[in-house]
Amino acid sequence: MSSTQFDHVTVIKKSNVYFGGACISHTVQFEDGTKKTLGVILPTEQPLTFETHVPERMEIISGECRVKIADSNESELFRAGQSFYVPGNSVFKIETDEVLDYVCHLEG
């Protein structure tokens, strides 16, 4: 089971706001220089498309979502406690019918 908190971190106060507020996150920096973002995605009528620059592991904390990675024709369902991986320099589409809490682990 994963931890419910991060210790010994720096939180960047300014939020990252995407898609007119449908996705809001904050960046967390660790002592070793690694970063994660903690965020919320609100329900939308259409999937949200994100571009990655570094590999990302998206950990779902609460809610559920449907995700298409890169050129996949199939969406996959992810629920709280699950994660999905997106390669660097790629795209993914995500949609949810409920509030989705996530941690994005920036792995590059």
From Swiss-Prot:
<dbReference type="GO" id="GO:0005829">
    <property type="term" value="C:cytosol"/>
</dbReference>
<dbReference type="InterPro" id="IPR009664">
    <property type="entry name" value="Ppnp"/>
</dbReference>
<dbReference type="GO" id="GO:0047975">
    <property type="term" value="F:guanosine phosphorylase activity"/>
</dbReference>
<dbReference type="Pfam" id="PF06865">
    <property type="entry name" value="Ppnp"/>
</dbReference>
<dbReference type="InterPro" id="IPR011051">
    <property type="entry name" value="RmlC_Cupin_sf"/>
</dbReference>
<comment type="function">
    <text>Catalyzes the phosphorolysis of diverse nucleosides, yielding D-ribose 1-phosphate and the respective free bases. Can use uridine, adenosine, guanosine, cytidine, thymidine, inosine and xanthosine as substrates. Also catalyzes the reverse reactions.</text>
</comment>
<keyword id="KW-0808">Transferase</keyword>
<dbReference type="InterPro" id="IPR014710">
    <property type="entry name" value="RmlC-like_jellyroll"/>
</dbReference>
<keyword id="KW-0328">Glycosyltransferase</keyword>
<dbReference type="GO" id="GO:0009032">
    <property type="term" value="F:thymidine phosphorylase activity"/>
</dbReference>
<dbReference type="GO" id="GO:0004731">
    <property type="term" value="F:purine-nucleoside phosphorylase activity"/>
</dbReference>
<dbReference type="GO" id="GO:0004850">
    <property type="term" value="F:uridine phosphorylase activity"/>
</dbReference>
<protein>
    <recommendedName>
        <fullName>Pyrimidine/purine nucleoside phosphorylase</fullName>
        <ecNumber>2.4.2.1</ecNumber>
        <ecNumber>2.4.2.2</ecNumber>
    </recommendedName>
</protein>
<comment type="similarity">
    <text>Belongs to the nucleoside phosphorylase PpnP family.</text>
</comment>
